[in-house]
Amino acid sequence: RDLVRSRGLGDVYKRQERVKSGQLMATLHGDIRVLLSGERVALNYLQRMSGIASYTRQIADLLAGSKTKLLDTRKTTPNMRVFEKYAVKVGGGYNHRYNLSDGILLKDNHIGAAGSVRKAVEMAKEYAPFVRKIEVEVEDLDMVKEAVEAGADIIMLDNMTPEIMKEAIRIIDGKAETECSGNVTRENVERLV
């Protein structure tokens, strides 16, 4: 807090502007003791968030011109979610869910407890009939078919090969939004579009 209240922070770049290695990003003015006491923490945050934003931008640029959006995960570093999610947005990505209350995501443990994809979707619709979209994480084409038939709003294709994903998207045929998750990297993302 003292660092922020210090006598001056002069930005020399704009948010989302690309910064080159060695480029001056900001100037600070104030009590040297206050500045030095917060320097390392500020640098750590700046480096981490810049890294997230930069990596996100690299992948978002690969998706430019397609209908595909790059979404983040809810799995963030403890106490850093707001910063990390903001860094994703600055980098050109989109936030998926901020927390568990932002949507219903049925995973393998929910499906196992319910007995089937269909039953899990039915139970979720009973629990929250109008307030949330229901997303189902599926691992194979049988689960895809069941999720479509059950009326899932979003179907997440988890750890599938690009070939199986294409078949899954053919089965879904626009009846639900589609996400892919797991093993998506800068090196393979263009094959998934």
Regions found by a protein language model. Give the residues of each.
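C-terminal non-catalytic interaction appendages of large macromolecular assemblies
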Residues: 182-193
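Acidic/glycine-rich phosphate/pyrophosphate-binding loops and surrounding catalytic core
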Residues: 1, 7-137, 142-150, 154, ...
